[in-house]
Amino acid sequence: MPGSYFSFATMPATFTLGKLERLKRRKVIDQLFSEGKAFTVFPVRVQYLFSALPDAVPLQAGFTASGRNFKKAVDRNRIKRLMREAYRLQKNPLQEQLLQKQKQLGLFFIYTGRELPDYTLVNEKIAVILKRLTRVVNESSAKNT
């Protein structure tokens, strides 16, 4: 449109999932799976670990779907995209909690179901997971003080 101006600076930066917020380093992922804790809110399993992350962000997350349950890469990619979107829109309370407590948390979401989910199911499950993780952050900070 002529005369209109759009800038990324005007967009809220809180609902982003940038490169630094993604869990990518093999060493950190291996540590997460060897030393971390886990719980399941079917059909999503979450592996998490409070640790010093390599980047200066309070929260890093990774996402995966089983190649055993979903043979087509299109299906696996869709599931990961749905989980990333639900996480991106709901991570803010947990992120602010971690900033207040000055902690860093690594997360890995694993889709364990056998059927292709819809967005509402994934959104509900990610919401439950993030609320539970917020409680875990509060409990861990209460133990340390």
Identify what each model region corresponds to:
Residues 1-145:
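Positively charged, solvent-exposed patches that mediate nucleic-acid binding
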